[in-house]
Amino acid sequence: MDPHELTLLEAAAALHTRQLGHLEYVQALLAQTDRLISLNAWISRDPEGLVLQAKALDKASSAPSEHLPLAGIPVAIKDNIDTSDLPTSGGTRSLLDARPQRNAPVVDVLLQAGALIAGKTNLHELALGGTTNNAVSGACRNPWNPLRIPGGSSGGSAVAVAARMVPAALGTDTGASVRLPAALCGVVGFRPSTGRYASPGILHLSPTKDTVGPMARCVADVAWLDGLLAKDRLHLPNVSLKGLRLGIPRGDFFEGADPQVLAVIEQALDTLVAEGVVCVTLDVPDLKQHNDATGSTLVMFEMMQSLPAYAKAQGLSMDALLAGVGSPDVARILSRQLGHERVTAAAYAAALARRQKLQAAYARHFADHRLDALIFPTCLMTAPLIGQDDRVHLSGRQVPTFQTLIRNTDPGSNAGLPGISLPAGLTAEGLPVGLELDGALGTDRHLLAVTAAIERVLPRLPRPPVVQA
């Protein structure tokens, strides 16, 4: 197997036993990155530094300690997570040269485990969107079809993993930003329960909603990283599918979806039923009602506290930050919030109250039906073409791009629930479809174990066309 095809845990084992050299591994990933540089997954990198670190590891007289389980493994970091050795730009012009004084704690956890920082990945400007069509850093391209978006806002992280440039990456997720690009790029992306990982050192939009999330090509890798970042168990227990209870929220989570997406999802559900899973159809209009009164209000209000504070820490005013914004959709959002459409404190307080009702509704559905997880399409559609930033065509209608892309992921985010997207299969057009599972608040390890069991019975995706070429 080519070194760049190894999963995170496979690569770690091969490096630890010296079946694979650190320099050989790093050079394989760098070659893959250089070959697919046109996908525009990266904003900043230090390939020479990676090579030097790999050479030093190879020269060591003994194999890395068990206390360095990720020794020599390059991991990609979304460019809104602070790193002291590389700039943290947020994908916006005013911060392109901003160098934080210290790493985000989540980055330090990786480094303390021996990981190498592969570079900082492209994102939707300031993480304020779902396409990663960034006018400052350039459009990021989907490895399954480079004319299409990878999703966002953590698009570069998903592309780097899917295109075998790295075995794993960190993104951030406010309403979709890890799970959406994971779904559209055919990888696994996990949003933990809010607060499970350390949150300092992030260019926040909404501290109430934001969380770092790991991405990889299999659930085992994501689960291992979750254990590391949360200081929890590193390996998952085996879970039997027989008797698992999964809630299917028909209605808003399925209505209006692309028929090709639905076909893949229904086939996956049929497979699970054949394996003994109990699927419970749910009627959950309360989730949409509470969510509609919560999400954007929370983000817009908190963003106008968080962004000025981050800019000030970098020696910038909010006006200077806004002047450097290149993406029209992001500029519009910020201009509105700086003007007469700014969310009021009263509206924010009302949204927080509705969030509590949303959380209570989720808890009630899980308890009443004794559910292990909810299961539904991560996204109602496959990856749209680059440039469809405002409206997309879906099931015979023109619909708003951002709201459509995040429709299924946003409610769980607002409730702070753990959620994971894994590949369910490919459409007839050869585009990935993501299957999302959301767990009850705080059930992260059980959700990951359930998802690992489901992954074992679903078809494994082939490599993306650009990787096969």
Describe the residue ranges of each PLM region.
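Acyltransferase
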Residues: 22-27, 55, 259-284, 308-323, ...
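Structural helix-boundary/capping segments
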Residues: 35, 112, 163-255, 266-275, ...
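Residue-level signal for inorganic ion chemistry
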Residues: 29, 50, 222, 246, ...
